[in-house]
Amino acid sequence: MSIENLEHSLKEVREQLKNHELYAQLDSVEDIRTFMESHVYAVWDFMSLLKALQRELTCTDLPWKPASDTTVARFINEIVLEEESDFNEEGVAKSHFEMYLDAMEEVNANTSKVKGVIGNFGNLEAIAGQIKKADLNLAERNFLASLLRSSIPENRISLPRPLPLEGKN
């Protein structure tokens, strides 16, 4: 499948996302703060998923060897370049995650929680325990666990399966 075919096949889904009903429900700065304080985990996790794709579809190991599909490798690496080191409005290279944190601070959203959670993800073996211990609501914990599970090989880490939506919300 070519990049053009992929983009075409995603066009309808992209339109649905652009016109999602959630946007109409964000009526105040407080609503935006609340949304951002949970959505930030999706922004962070996107990079984890992207790095998993980069690991699988390009070569990030030593010794280096050419990727089996250099068109896909280039596409992934271009996305990684932009996500990891795009330029903000001041011309400073920052990751999109860091830019999102800056935007959160502009609207006085709480960034200390996500910085604490992500900051404790020092190694793969500690992630499951950190997710359990973190001050996250159940939906946030399940989101992180399920998406990390899809981006980290099972032989590297054991993450909890999503829990029923009850308990700490």
Model-based region annotation:
Residues S68:
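Active-site cofactor/substrate anionic-group-binding motifs, chiefly glycine-
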Residues S2-K18, D27-K65, E82-F87, S146-N169:
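Alpha-helical bundle segments that constitute or directly flank the non-heme di-iron/ferroxidase center
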Residues R74-N169:
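Active-site-proximal alpha-helical scaffolds that flank and shape metal-associated catalytic sites
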